[in-house]
Amino acid sequence: MGKIRHIAITAEDPFVTAELFKKALGLQEISRGDSELAREVYLTDGYINLAIVCWKRTKETPNPYPDGYGLDHFGVHVEDLESAEAKARKAGATSQPPPPVDLSKLAGNTLYFEKKLTLAGIKFDLSGHGWATQKEE
């Protein structure tokens, strides 16, 4: 069975939003970044991570949030990536279209997902190795 380990939301100011969630819920910060593509903060409760991201407006992506801010996707840690993907596809999941940006250029995050899928209009990631739940020393 897959386990939800990552939830990603978008916010106008991820740095301010992260401070609010840290104060309100006692979440711990794992990392943050400010690259040419996005401002981002990664929080955790030690079990599930919360990614708070704001993609920057670029020539290629002048309006990254046509529908506003909020839930973007969730990530599931699975034991067997291939069988989990096959099971999801059998249920109707399809590949997400490629993002409009090169995610490898993000400053504050290692790319933990291995498969990006959509099911019933909801985006989710699958990962066989999971997400970091503590700050790297």
Language model regions located:
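N-terminal beta-strand motif that seeds the catalytic metal site of vicinal oxygen chelate
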Residues: M1-A18, L71-V78, S127-E137
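Core segments of cupin and vicinal oxygen chelate
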Residues: G2, I9-L50, K90, P98, ...
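Short, conserved charged micro-motifs
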Residues: V16, L81-A86
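A generic structural micro-feature
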Residues: T44, Y65-G68
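Conserved beta-strand in the GNAT
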Residues: A51-V53, D125
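A cross-kingdom feature marking solvent-exposed beta-strand/loop segments within repeated
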Residues: K59-T61
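Vicinal oxygen chelate
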Residues: V76, E85-E137
